[in-house]
Amino acid sequence: MQAPWFLALCFFVLPVAGQDDRLAFPSVEVEASLPGVGPLRRYEGLMKRWPELRAKWATEVEADQKSVVFLGDSITQGWGTSLPGRFPGMKSANRGIGGDTTRGMLVRLDDVLALNPSAIVLLMGTNDLEIGLEPSVAAENVKLILAAIKAHDAKVPVVLCQVFPSSPEKSRPKEKVQALNRLYADLVRGEEQVTLLDTWTLFAGPDGEADPKWFKDLLHLNPEGYARWAAALRPVLATLGFIETERVESPVEEGFVSLFNGKDLTGWGVRPTPPRKPSKNPPKPDAPVFVEVAEALNFDGKKTSDDGRYAAINGRLVVKTPAEGRRIQQLWTTEEFGGDFILKLEFRATPNADSGVFIRQPQLQCRDFPLAGPYQDLKNYKPQDWNELVVTVQDGKARATCNGEILEEAMAVPATGPIGLEGDRGQMEYRHIRLKKLD
């Protein structure tokens, strides 16, 4: 059911005859009647850009139907016309206005909804902090934006990017940015429609402020920063089906057998989990969810696990970002492997993602290593790109390398057992999973 504020919003911005006044930057008097909380930001550049861009976009509504729409401020506007090149094959539309706040984006949300978007990528909130608003104000407006999107289409995927780090010099201290990102995480926890992307850790330096490597002024991205943001988005957009829609075939080397056919989860399933001890303390809202399994199930012929977390998509075994923030569970091969062997696979992680590969039973951490650890000093790791993991098991010890660099020299493993893939936080993808017995 649409709330009255949403109807008022539609009346204000719907592209109909005589819309010029409605596309104008709202006067103080008009602002009082608009949805949202906190004042609109007012300065000459923004008040000039607002009507100019919105009038231009009003002429592009038909052409931009079903686009993946990027909504935000100057950082989003800074994509310019580069989106098609960043995400080949994906129809996209940029609805960023430099200087805008979360309330401004709420007011002009129909610039997005009028396109009946296939997906929406959100980055917003940094300018609210700059004008002295509390993080709770921005979070309330984002809550209203998400509610309006759901009212328009409850199935359209939303990617909510965490607010990027900045600097006290820009009136955006890390404490405020981190507080806002915590509110965003609380806001979307349990919301299947929204994927939260950790773009704060992606761009933060050791001090928690903007890493100058990625910014031209500790606020706006430089070209390397945009390349990094695009790389962070690609795995999520691929999982949603907008890019990388063709399966990448890779021959299986002589002596190896494939453990994943690339089409479905045949050969994989779940196994009973050990009973967990009940906690003496009440659970925290942001505590990880542990998935308990009572009996073994196999997913032969199925494209997804029963809960949808694990999915076979165009040759990739995807462990999706959990709506809970952290959801700890495992997918196992139905076959067990004794003796000596070599396991090879490739993996790709979203920023700060946490997963793992079980070698019979012990877990080898498989993460976005530079951000999530524990192997943070790897020279050959490729962030948000495909990396090769090779595990050689001999005489009860496992030697593991990532792109040729040693992760573990002699990890003890049992005599036999399955191969498993863990899900925790973020998205992890695996492909070309194969094994060669050495006996």
Question: What are these language model-derived features?
Answer:
Residues 1-70, 76-81, 85-86, 115, ...:
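N-terminal secretory targeting modules
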Residues 35-45, 80, 88-103, 130, ...:
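Acidic/histidine-rich helix-loop elements
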Residues 67-71, 92-96, 119-124, 157-162, ...:
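Structural recognition of the beta-strand scaffold that forms the well-ordered cores
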Residues 74-78, 98-102, 126-131, 164-168, ...:
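Solvent-exposed loop/turn segments at secondary-structure junctions
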Residues 76-93, 102-143, 148, 159, ...:
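Oxyanion-hole/transition-state-stabilizing segment in secreted/luminal serine hydrolases
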Residues 132-136, 170-174, 377-378, 413:
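Short, solvent-exposed loop/turn segments at secondary-structure boundaries
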Residues 143, 243-439:
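Carbohydrate-interacting regions of secretory-pathway proteins
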Residues 165-244:
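Catalytic His-Asp segment of secreted/periplasmic serine-dependent ester chemistry enzymes
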